């Protein structure tokens, strides 16, 4: 449980301290010192997740925090395989729909190089939402 809390804090610190000048998955950086609090891996992680999910990347530390709280409470709920599958499916649908809504809210005219409008997943989900609705 302590490891999960530490992972939550680390991922959140990596996302919050993202800098476009750091070397990451989509850029080589400006050549200066790494500004990300998570170091080189943190810069890479934040770059990848912000490009892939946009602002919805912040849902991942949130779900880890909720999972930590659930473990801390030592929940007596039924924890069958089906319940875990439903929780995972619910989280997946939440992330996909949040990315799509971000894309629709921020508009398709934005520069998606920073992943602002739901990231790459938002482009796919938002385009699908435009076609369907």
Q: Which ranges hold each PLM region?
A:
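Alpha-helical transmembrane segments used as membrane anchors
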Residues: 1-133
């Amino acid at each position: 449980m302590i490891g999960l809390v530490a992972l939550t804090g680390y991922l959140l610190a990596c996302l919050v301290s993202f800098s476009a000048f750091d070397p990451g998955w989509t850029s080589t950086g400006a050549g200066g010192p790494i500004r990300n609090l998570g170091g080189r891996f943190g810069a890479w992680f934040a770059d990848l997740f912000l490009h892939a999910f946009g602002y919805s990347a912040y849902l991942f530390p949130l779900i880890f925090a909720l999972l930590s709280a659930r473990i801390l409470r030592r929940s007596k709920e039924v924890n069958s395989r089906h319940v875990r599958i439903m929780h995972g499916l619910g989280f997946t649908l939440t992330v996909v729909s949040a990315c799509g809504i971000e894309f629709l809210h921020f508009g398709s005219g934005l520069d998606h190089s920073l992943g602002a409008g739901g990231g790459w997943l938002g482009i796919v989900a938002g385009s699908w939402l435009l076609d369907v609705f």
